[in-house]
Structures are given as C-alpha cells and as structure tokens.
UniProtKB/Swiss-Prot annotation:
Family membership noted in the UniProt record: Belongs to the YciB family.
Originating species: Shewanella pealeana (strain ATCC 700345 / ANG-SQ1)
Domain of life: Bacteria
Pfam families, alphabetized: IspA (PF04279)
Subcellular locations according to the entry: Cell inner membrane
Keyword Transmembrane helix: yes
Keyword Transmembrane helix listed: yes
Gene Ontology CC entries for this record: plasma membrane
Protein name from the UniProt record: Inner membrane-spanning protein YciB
The organism's taxonomic lineage, starting at the top: Bacteria, Pseudomonadati, Pseudomonadota, Gammaproteobacteria, Alteromonadales
Alphabetical list of NCBIfam families matching this protein: ispZ (TIGR00997), PRK00259.1-2 (NF001324), PRK00259.1-3 (NF001325)
Bilayer topology term: Multi-pass membrane protein
Length: 181
C-alpha cells in the first residue's frame, strides 16, 4: 500500500497531462502530492521527511510553473530533487552517518565499506539522472520529457534499487542472509 501511495502523484500527473496539458498536470501534481500527505498521515499517523520535501518542491516549482506559465520550472524540479538527494547522501557519508545505512542497516547487515560503496553509487546515480533530465527536458519535446520522467526515471530507479539490494545481499554474511529468509 505504501509503495502504491508513493506513485499516486506521478500517476495522476501523467494521466492529467495526457488528457490536458503540462499546466493542468502541474496543478494536479500539487493536489495529488498534498493528497498523498493526507492519506499517509491518516494511514500511518506520521509523515515521512521525503514526502514533506517532495511536497514543498512540487508546490514551489509547480506554482511557479502555473503563475509564470513556464514549464521549465516543473522540469527543473526533477533535477533539483535529485541534486538534493545526492548532496544529502554524500554529506551523510562524509560525516560518517550514512543515510542508507541508517534506513536499511538493521535489516541488511554489511560492512561499512559496502554501505559507503552503495552510498556513492546512489550519489552518482542521482547526479547522472539529474543531468540526463536536464538534457531530455530542454533538448527534446515536452511529451518526450513527460514520458522519460514517468517511465524512464521510474524504471531506472527501480532497477537501481534491485541492483542495490542484490549487491547488499551478496555482501551479507551467510548467517545474516539466513535470518532474512
């Protein structure tokens, strides 16, 4: 249920874009992200930091898109969010408080050097995705960018997540692997 809720704003953005335009879709994205927060709070009695950050970013960049009638703001939002993720992960690793380890380290027990590799891998991933987003957003058609944002970046993130879990699992001790099964 939680994962479906995470995709709600993206699905609504895409559907509204296909029937209307980028501006109505941007407004729908703001509303859907707010709805996501409300549903998340009602179901889980708490709000995740990532959802709050996403809501603020969507609201700011979506509103600028609507007010100035300029789709470049909603396009930049993707790159800025990825840049923030990369910075947060990189800084947390440099300060020896890796975010990924703090989120997953209780279930997936591996050496700190493995967490460092995974963290820098994700930093690189977010930087590359942010740069590719800039290229697609400003060099190709708006429709191509929307499809890339919805399907391309989502697929890349899911593939990256699977690869990360496989890598972490491979680097776990045999005993810890058995405990997960």
């Amino acid at each position: 249920m939680k994962q479906l809720l995470d995709f709600l704003p993206l699905v609504i953005f895409f559907a509204v874009y296909k029937f209307f335009d980028i501006y109505i879709a941007s407004g729908a994205l703001i509303a859907a992200t707010a709805l996501q927060l409300v549903i998340s709070y009602l179901l889980y009695k708490k709000l995740e930091k990532m959802h709050l950050i996403t809501f603020v970013m969507v609201t700011v960049f979506g509103s600028l898109t609507l007010i100035l009638h300029d789709d470049s703001f909603i396009k930049w939002k993707v790159t800025i969010v990825y840049a923030l993720f990369a910075i947060a992960l990189g800084v947390s690793q440099i300060m020896n408080k890796p975010l990924l380890k703090s989120m997953l380290g209780k279930e997936l027990i591996v050496e700190d050097k493995i967490w460092a590799r995974v963290t820098w891998y994700w930093v690189s991933f977010f930087v590359v995705c942010g740069l590719v987003n800039i290229y697609v957003a400003f060099s190709l058609s708006q429709e191509t960018w929307v499809n890339f944002k919805v399907f391309g970046l989502t697929a890349l993130t899911l593939i990256n997540t699977v690869l990360t879990v496989v890598y972490l699992f491979k680097n776990m001790s045999e005993e810890d692997r058995k405990e997960l099964k």
